[in-house]
């Protein structure tokens, strides 16, 4: 099975939306742009026009070969075959239309990498989850809100993809506020497996003495991050 289909990838087919994504990234001629999932390459030429260099990573070998041949004359483009989350490239701006199945993984990866700004296409419902308030928050909501200033820039309908997905998408911006370690991310995820419990009871589950009857879901993001650091002694 094609990797992209297995991952739940639908290819953007609108050049006007591709241009909107690139324009929203606020790229300068001094910027190095990192793109995970080159796909059919609809974003890539626009990214190359605006930036110093574009590094695009594709894990589907057929798509990698196709885009390598298609964009062979673009001087400031480096195309890598492999997993974009496992490369060690330095960059300023992250731009991607990711498979929806990798959205949570992508957010956690973004939190650990020191770039300035990102524009990412995600499932619309996932975008709302990232921006959720207290009672509706998940671990990924707290982490994303603590690490980035986020906005939904545009809702994108199904007809703008091939094949048409069953759900709508959203273009989101991510302005860096903080960078988190893998250990801190794991700590927040662990805490949210007990999200309905009081801190005192969470402490017992984790073998830590905590004198507080406050519930995790009642805490603000800063309090949760501070508590997560205490658990892991980060």
Regions found by a protein language model. Give the residues of each.
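Conserved Class I S-adenosyl-L-methionine
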Residues: 166, 194-196, 201-234
